[in-house]
């Protein structure tokens, strides 16, 4: 088996080169050299610190982007149309993500992970989405939600048991939404009743991503319904647990290769050791994971929009009408420039939010801004690309119509665009 670029990185097979030049009297802590935080991307000029642009990356970041791009073009691109048509993710794609080290990007090396930065996760998701948003979503959930919940709230025993498998072979699924709990995330009806050393879960979940292939489900249920959201707790449920059933896939408009299923729990019995974190703290964990997850969705929407744009521009530079390239018409040039500017703004919002996470600084408002704006830009970009390509853009012979269908979900999941605006406004109200 070929050794992935991620494995070489983890093994130290690549030399580190940082972006720092400094005097002998100015020492950089070793951890900074391993970071892609803004603090690591600066130089010293005339005794003044000059921060690098948001799109300045470490050598590892650049290497990672190239590795993901190569994998996406060679292993995913040939299967995209078939996966979309059949509404099914090819197992070879999932296996490839694991083999390439893309399913444990931030996970510590002692658990078999790559031990890279949050920004690296964002860059991976963006590159995958340029080819297929469904694959990007699968990778996003595993890295920014499932693994993150274990790393932040799991016991040492849970980490040692689950993380090595989540990094190499086992897909996880985040189970929060219900029929009556969409934007009102904590209006959960699924409950978990204590019975000796066990909890018995009853209820159902809807719109659960990755459910078809997942082997481990992080299920949010209420152990004390009278206490409202303060009774919500996160439970670990294995796929083959008695009483647990996975329903049929939803027949969706977009991201069709990403499975979305209903789950039912009928007297599902799990031990106390299957509680992730503390009893009654599930709502905190869900909020935290969704906040970071929104940056992942922003990256997905950004990559999707960029992939569509990258495919369309060469076409309109070659397509001739009225004796000249359609790109040469000023009206079209202005539209292209407008879209390109919005793409760049979405990229900077997304990267900035990711770097705030790494720096340990408040990021909730910025995450909502990135997710909201990138989703809106994805919808605009893909719609314009179809218009620019004309009739052929409307056919399934070209990928732009799929990008268009995939883009719509960005304004809906991980918090609708209106929910993002509510969050942004709430923070502005507090700031003033």
Swiss-Prot record:
Swiss-Prot/TrEMBL GO biological process terms: acyl-CoA metabolic process; fatty acid beta-oxidation; fatty acid metabolic process; isoleucine catabolic process
Co-factor(s): FAD
Residue list for modification N6-succinyllysine: 70, 278, 284
Name of a matching Pfam family: Acyl-CoA_dh_1
Domain of life: Eukaryota
Pathway where this protein functions: Lipid metabolism; mitochondrial fatty acid beta-oxidation; Amino-acid degradation; L-isoleucine degradation
Binding site for FAD: 174-183, 207-209, 319, 330, 387-391, 416-418
EC number: 1.3.8.5
Role noted for this protein: Among the different mitochondrial acyl-CoA dehydrogenases, acts specifically on short and branched chain acyl-CoA derivatives such as (S)-2-methylbutyryl-CoA as well as short straight chain acyl-CoAs such as butyryl-CoA. Plays an important role in the metabolism of L-isoleucine by catalyzing the dehydrogenation of 2-methylbutyryl-CoA, one of the steps of the L-isoleucine catabolic pathway.
pH relationship of activity: Optimum pH is 8.0.
Residues of the active site: 414
Tissues showing expression: Ubiquitously expressed.
GO molecular function: acyl-CoA dehydrogenase activity; electron transfer activity; flavin adenine dinucleotide binding; identical protein binding; short-chain 2-methyl fatty acyl-CoA dehydrogenase activity; short-chain fatty acyl-CoA dehydrogenase activity
Keyword Transmembrane helix: no
Modified residues (Phosphoserine): 183
Organelle targeting sequence: 1-33
Top-level class of the enzyme under EC nomenclature: oxidoreductase
Protein's recorded name: Short/branched chain specific acyl-CoA dehydrogenase, mitochondrial
Presence of the UniProt keyword Cell membrane in the record: no
Compartmental location: Mitochondrion matrix
Modified residues (N6-acetyllysine): 70, 284, 426
Self-association and partners: Homotetramer.
Family listed: Belongs to the acyl-CoA dehydrogenase family.
